[in-house]
């Protein structure tokens, strides 16, 4: 694939968060497939996308978190969970009650996806995640 084609393919991939469904719905899937992107290249881009979205995590809105939750369904959910928990444990107190509840809900969904994937499941990470959810929800109720 030429450099220019690689850039165009990556732009499409990032625009739709790697989702073939969304590419198809918007009429860009056939164009994307013409670039013959390898699965290995897509894995590299997914990793870049996860890093980008983690850098965009905010207690002011939850768009990046929502995208990460969606990505966890077809990518390394455990790695996404690890990064979301790291951010949340440091920053969740900055958010209002609504944001705290949304974060708890999304983290729970990522936990479910992590358990479904069941690749070398780290129970310590799951337990830390549940502890963070409990602590955050107690804070909301107080």
Show which residues each predicted segment covers.
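Extended repeat-based scaffolds of very large eukaryotic assembly and lipid-transport proteins
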Residues: 1-75, 107-112, 123-140
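Conserved binding-pocket/active-site segment within a compact domain
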Residues: 80-142
């Amino acid at each position: 694939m030429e450099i220019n084609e690689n850039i165009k393919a990556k732009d499409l991939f990032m625009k739709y968060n790697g989702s073939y469904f969304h590419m198809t719905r918007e009429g860009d899937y056939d164009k994307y497939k013409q670039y013959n992107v390898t699965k290995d290249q897509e894995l590299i881009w997914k990793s870049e996308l996860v890093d980008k979205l983690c850098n965009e995590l905010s207690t002011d809105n939850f768009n990046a978190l929502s995208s990460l939750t969606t990505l966890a369904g077809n990518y390394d959910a455990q790695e996404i969970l690890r990064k979301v928990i790291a951010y949340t444990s440091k920053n969740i107190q900055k958010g209002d009650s609504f944001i705290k509840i949304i974060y708890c809900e999304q983290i729970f969904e990522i936990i479910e996806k992590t358990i479904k994937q069941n690749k070398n499941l780290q129970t310590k990470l799951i337990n830390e995640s549940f502890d963070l959810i409990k602590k955050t929800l107690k804070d909301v109720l107080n």
